[in-house]
Regions:
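Residues on the lipid-exposed face of transmembrane beta-strands in outer-membrane beta-barrel proteins
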Residues: 64, 68, 96-102, 142-146, ...
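Detector for outer-membrane/organellar transmembrane beta-barrel domains
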Residues: 106, 226, 230-386, 391-392
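Surface-exposed loop and membrane-interface regions of Gram-negative outer-membrane beta-barrel proteins
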Residues: 69-95, 101-150, 163-171, 206, ...
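Surface-exposed coil loops of outer-membrane beta-barrel proteins
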Residues: 119-142, 146-228, 234, 238-278, ...
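Transmembrane beta-strands of outer-membrane beta-barrel pores
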Residues: 68-74, 106, 114-120, 160-162, ...
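N-terminal periplasmic/intermembrane-space "pro-region" immediately following the signal or transit peptide
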Residues: 1-81, 438
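Repeated loop/turn-to-beta-strand initiation elements of outer-membrane beta-barrel proteins
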Residues: 106-110, 150-154, 186-195, 228-235, ...
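Outer-membrane beta-barrel "beta-signal"
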Residues: 424-438
């Protein structure tokens, strides 16, 4: 039509071109409006057709982490009457943990966590071995907690250790089984106190008197003091009362899955009386403290320490009342010359942050742990290969590649605290890790 108008002289060529341009712009504008209306309509339809999850599903939180590790050990041993041996061992290992927490009511929570490992209480590591065979998964946590008030929480089942403590006596992988109570109160704006109680099961014995099962009662009282805006001091005293240990009967001391077998292998000779009942006793005090300082250095720094003493350890009594039912000769204890071997201590520091991408963190401690200071079955499984009668250095560095991905390097440089009974055992260990949280 515009061309006809130009042919009849009613429109000039320039006027016709201008009119065509305006018409094209109007056409583009209308197309954009139609497209926008269609998009908005699609959004509204998506809102009305979106699947709404049940409220109980929204209360569930899932989490997990994967750790890939290269682990090298260098060991030098010289047992009494034998030649010195040296060897080193390389292993490629992993740890996988998958957890779920559900807020069942305003005051209650249920949690479950699965983990890799061999089933031992103080490790979740699993080696890549056995020509690619499948790996086992265990129940690492299964608990219910109730918080009836802000100052009180009660947890039952297999749960996280609530105690303020150190790896000198508790490996972080140990999740006690039983009931725990945690209380905390603010005395002033700068001073708070806390208490943790534990009633935890050690063994379930196949005997008629179920009240005699070995049990641990833990009592902890501590305080948190805000010395200044950037300085916090935390300390606690804990008593561990191991009950009914004399009901444990002599068994296969080579079975490291048992309480007596694990302890016996890891420097704690288990001694039995003429009725083949365990004589070893544990009634342990632990004192721990940590000082946290911020804003003095470019990164936070912490100083910490721990001391443990088993007041029930008595080498003379073990030698006097003990017999040798098969693989536990009390005469071997003569080499300790009456020393009860009942204490241990740790001091260290950490520096850095471990929260987000670009953060770095470093930690160092030195420790000494005598044979009978605390049950070997619960202490750090990596330091000196696990167990007691050790001393040495621990150092670790971390760098956060992403908020949820970190690279770690850990070193253990250890030896026997006392070589008089079991001989020399020096062990150095390097672990290189990549840890991914999800």
């Amino acid at each position: 039509m515009i061309n006809k108008l130009v042919e009849k002289g009613m429109l000039s060529v320039s006027e016709a071109q201008e009119l065509l341009t305006e018409m094209q712009k109007e056409n583009d504008r209308q197309k954009a409006e139609i497209k926008q209306v269609a998009v908005e309509a699609a959004k509204e339809e998506a809102k009305t057709t979106k699947v709404k999850l049940p409220k109980w599903v929204e209360r569930i939180k899932l989490s997990g982490d994967l750790r890939l590790r290269h682990d090298t050990q260098w060991r030098t041993e010289k047992k009494p009457g034998k030649d010195e041996e040296k060897y080193h061992r390389n292993r490629e290992r992993f740890r996988l943990r998958l957890g779920m927490r559900a807020k069942t009511t305003e005051t209650t929570e249920v949690g479950v966590r699965l983990a890799s490992g061999s089933g031992y209480q103080n490790t979740t590591n699993q080696s890549f071995d056995e020509h690619g065979r499948g790996k086992e998964i265990f129940i690492d946590k299964a608990y219910a907690s109730w918080q009836p008030a802000d100052f009180l929480e009660i947890t039952g089942g297999k749960h996280k250790n609530p105690l303020f403590t150190a790896p000198l006596v508790w490996d972080p992988d140990v999740n006690p089984e039983g009931v725990s109570e945690s209380l905390k109160f603010d005395i002033t704006d700068n001073v708070g106190i806390f208490a943790n109680l534990g009633q935890w099961f050690i063994e379930e014995l196949n005997v008629k008197d179920t009240n005699s099962d070995p049990t641990l009662l833990a009592y902890q009282l501590g305080s948190v003091i805000k010395v200044a805006d950037n300085i916090k001091f935390e300390f606690a005293a804990t008593y561990y009362d191991f009950l009914n240990m004399d009901t444990v009967e002599y068994g296969d001391l080579t079975d490291t899955a048992s309480f007596i077998g694990y302890n016996h292998k890891h420097s704690q000779q288990m001694i039995f009386d003429s009725d083949e009942k365990l004589l070893n006793e544990f009634g342990c005090w632990e004192l721990g403290a940590k000082l946290k300082i911020k804003d003095v250095l470019p990164v936070p720094i912490s100083l910490f320490g721990s001391y443990v003493k088993n007041q029930e350890a008595d080498i003379d009594e073990l030698m006097e009342k003990g017999v040798d039912p098969g693989d536990s000769d009390p005469a071997k204890l003569e080499k300790y010359s009456g020393d009860d071997r009942d204490s241990g201590w740790l001091v260290g520091l950490s520096v850095g942050n471990k929260k987000k991408k670009g953060n770095w963190y470093a930690k160092y401690h030195y420790q000494e742990l005598e044979d009978y200071a605390f049950p070997a079955v619960f202490v750090d499984s990596d330091f000196h290969g696990g167990g007691s009668n050790n001393k040495g250095h621990y150092v670790q560095g971390r760098y956060f590649i992403r908020d949820n991905i970190q690279a770690r390097a850990t070193g253990f440089f250890t030896k026997r605290e006392d070589e008089s009974k079991d001989g020399k055992k020096d062990e150095d260990r390097i672990q290189l890790d990549i840890v991914i949280a999800f």
